[in-house]
Amino acid sequence: MEEYHRHCDEVGFNADEAHNIVKECIDGVLGGEDYNQNNINQWTASIVEQSLTHLVKLGKAYKYIVTCAVVQRSAYGFHTASSCFWDTTSDGTCTVRWENRTMNCIVNVFAIAIVL
């Protein structure tokens, strides 16, 4: 793994930065694809691994949890929820919703500050 330096003087999770990173990862994996059940495991694994790699490369003092769900688009919709008990001044979350004509994707990033 590449070396990086942590920026410990920064306070607070930058959800916009995380959103942009995750969106690029989703676009790179799912962009131009149609829903195919046989590819879901590979797609979701690629999205979470790439997102996590790029988040860690930021060098910030966080532990990250990244989840991804991809479902076939239907008239019934798709709903998710999450809840966290943490320090809202330093920890944070980001949810990215992505869709095309055949599928929906939801990625959640949970960032927990490492306090030394």
Swiss-Prot record:
The modification 3'-nitrotyrosine is found at residue 4. GO terms for cellular component: cytoplasm; cytoplasmic dynein complex; kinetochore; microtubule; nucleus. It comes from the Eukaryota. It is found in: Nucleus; Cytoplasm, Cytoskeleton; Chromosome, Centromere, Kinetochore. Pfam families: Tctex-1 (PF03645). Keywords: Cell cycle, Cell division, Centromere, Chromosome, Cytoplasm, Cytoskeleton, Dynein, Kinetochore, Microtubule, Mitosis, Motor protein, Nitration, Nucleus, Transport. GO terms for biological process: cell division; microtubule-based movement; regulation of mitotic cell cycle. Coiled coil: none annotated. Homodimer. The cytoplasmic dynein 1 complex consists of two catalytic heavy chains (HCs) and a number of non-catalytic subunits presented by intermediate chains (ICs), light intermediate chains (LICs) and light chains (LCs); the composition seems to vary in respect to the IC, LIC and LC composition. The heavy chain homodimer serves as a scaffold for the probable homodimeric assembly of the respective non-catalytic subunits. The ICs and LICs bind directly to the HC dimer and the LCs assemble on the IC dimer. DYNLT1 and DYNLT3 compete for association with dynein IC (DYNC1I1 or DYNC1I2). Belongs to the dynein light chain Tctex-type family. This is Dynein light chain Tctex-type 3. It comes from Canis lupus familiaris (Dog). The gene is DYNLT3.
